[in-house]
Amino acid sequence: VAARPTPPLPTPVPIIDLPQTIPTAAPQADPAARIEIPELGIDLQVVPGDGVNAPYYKAAEYPAPFKLPGQGGRSMIYAHAQKGMFGPLFNGKVGQHVDVTLASGRELHYAIREYYAHWPVDDLRWFQPGDHEQLLLVTCTTYNPNDPRIVAVAEPV
């Protein structure tokens, strides 16, 4: 008995003929790498944060729902209120300059527009999405997590 050749498989045809789209890569994140507030002597490396823990001798970017600095929304960087970190923020003032260097090397320049020395910890208005570029700088006022925070709101210059 001679073997018969296997018939070719049919060419698949789409059930619905949709135009083919080629997925594009999502925009690359360009996180903050360094924050400086020259008038206060603050100069810190910035690392990704979890929104709970602040690393020692570094500042952290708050995760979603916040955007990264330079993305056109509200972003937050936080650090401990100690010497060598955000401790000097106790002397923050409207008009002080904030410089952020992104991982790509791009530099962003802000100025503090609002300063709150005793922001109530249960007032979450700053945790809402912003409608324009803002950089929030946050630190504690004591070791008690229920005590007020220092909040400085900076905007691009």
For each of these PLM feature ranges, what is it?
Residues 1-157:
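Solvent-exposed, non-transmembrane regions of membrane-associated and secreted proteins
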